[in-house]
């Protein structure tokens, strides 16, 4: 349990922004359901440090199984997707920020696109497969592309100008990402575990195995 927005703001200010070179695009992933923060002030703090883009994946209630008891408890306590939509609208309409919306279900995806009108929308097809800690019982890459394309079609109906990107499920490798580009009508992809977890696991495991295989000369 931690203050995710404070952690995001502090890390961005102290570690990311000082290390930036050139014209990198920095997006702050914020928790719009933070009961201890005025989101207008959080957004202003982002702008003040030079961050001009925000997303609602920090974390999102959309990720929680909507049929679960915990989802019902959270929403009844005021932790809602509507708060995330309101944050994205505030960032775009009143603060002039680039917004990246995200949804884990078709219903939530349509709601975010219709109400928040984000500049970019990322359809999250599910937890990324692969690696040491990946979830390996999810969709195939073909199913991931099919499900993602269906979400794209529905999102365009309510927000025709949105830029659409894919994420998650079976999109584990660059080859998988190429499959998504070739078999969906989106504009790109958003990586996570496929760039910052799985390749590192492989590299560290390979290096450790090589060291472990060393022997003293006779």
Model-derived regions, located:
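Alpha/beta catalytic cores of nucleotide-metabolism and tRNA/nucleoside-modifying enzymes
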Residues: 145-165, 171-218
